[in-house]
Regions:
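Predominantly soluble domains enriched in secretory-pathway, periplasmic, or organellar proteins
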Residues: 16-354
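Sec-dependent N-terminal signal peptides
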Residues: 5-13
Length: 354
């Protein structure tokens, strides 16, 4: 009887093990060169499948991705064809789309109110005219419900306050950033408050000085500090969101690109485009570490997992994406996408399901 009870217990445990494999941890990576979005498992290091975003059959170039876990959708910008696409988070099927116009770049998502804010970037290699526009989209029905003209060329970096009332946007060409009241979208007379990134640049935001080339913005989780990656000056600058005053300057690798803050605001992660490395800054102690791999070349996006233990980094130069263990500062996974198509994959945007 005891032997039979032992065997029954063993089979139950074995059955439970088979039913509960290592949890799939899904992430999305835009492959700008292949008109696809890779859906990957960052725990197993496996590509689950590819989502075709060849929306117009003319080369759409998916650039950036954000996830709405509250309503189970994800969104992707197509910088070449000017669309923003909406997908079902469970099935990865296309739900809806909206045409924005030339170069929709980065997005900020207000999950509670279901609004998307889209920055319109500069044209690539003179393909079209520069934009000065930021759009507000009703994500429920994918319609543009308002636009703000910041007055400066190539708005790119974008960050939304936790209450959804303030949108921060930085020009990539003029060394200014803007504080936009989100309820003023659609008001053609509205000019948002602007701040200079440095005292050494023109006071006018209409001058494309190109001194700092701001790339991405991140807000601290209490909304008190704004982090600005300055790709031309190889630094991240930190500003007070009440006064716009400069609080700190953090030196990085060559050409800092996308940035992420840990949930407790204790660490800053910076993908260095030409430095082919990730700078990790302890904002409490000031200590700086570097994450890198010999195969890395021309970095772009980065994304943190829910508990900040994993960092996903994209590398258009190598055609790969990388997953690092933050605590041990070791490389865990490398994703290659070159076998999907003859064209270079150019992984850019990255987002992890939390």
């Amino acid at each position: 009887m005891k032997k039979n009870s032992f065997m029954l217990s063993f089979l139950i445990v074995l059955g439970c093990d088979e039913r509960n494999p290592v949890e799939v941890h899904k992430a999305y990576i835009t492959l700008q060169g292949q008109d696809k979005v890779a859906v990957v498992d960052i725990n197993a290091g496996e590509v689950l499948h590819y989502v075709d975003v060849d929306f117009t059959n003319t080369g759409d170039m998916p650039h950036f991705v954000v996830i709405d876990e509250t309503h189970n959708y994800w969104y992707c910008t197509l910088i070449a064809s000017g669309y923003v696409l909406k997908f079902d988070l469970q099935t990865d099927e296309l739900v809806d789309s909206v045409h924005i116009g030339n170069m929709p770049a980065l997005m900020a998502l207000d999950e509670e109110r279901e609004y998307l804010y889209i920055s319109r970037f500069m044209p690539m290699m003179g393909m079209s005219t520069s934009s000065q526009l930021v759009h507000k989209i009703d994500a429920q029905n994918m319609t543009i419900i308002g636009t703000v003209n910041v007055g400066a060329d190539s708005p790119h970096g974008i960050a939304l306050s936790s209450d959804g009332e303030t949108l921060w946007v930085a020009s990539n060409q003029a060394s200014h950033f803007f504080k936009i009241e989100t309820d003023r979208f659609g008001d053609t007379s509205y000019q948002p408050q602007n701040f200079r990134i440095g005292t050494d640049v023109p006071s006018s935001y209409e001058i494309n000085d190109g001194f700092y080339n701001a790339l991405e913005l991140e807000l601290s989780h209490d909304d008190s500090e704004l982090y600005v990656s300055c790709s031309n000056s190889m630094e991240v600058r930190v500003f007070d969101t009440e006064s716009g005053d400069s609080l700190n300057t953090i030196m990085t690798g060559m050409m800092p690109w996308h940035i992420q803050l840990s949930k407790d605001d204790s660490e800053l992660f910076v993908s260095n485009r030409m430095g082919s490395s990730v700078t990790v800054v302890n904002l409490i102690s000031g200590n700086i570490n570097t994450l890198t791999d010999d195969s890395m070349s021309i970095l772009h996006g980065c994304a943190l997992s829910a508990n900040d233990d994993l960092l996903l980094v994209t590398s258009p130069g190598s055609g790969n994406a990388y997953v690092f263990d933050i605590e041990n500062k070791t490389l865990l996974q490398t994703f290659g996408f070159s076998d999907v198509s003859d064209t270079d994959p150019m992984p850019t945007g990255a987002a992890i399901v939390q």
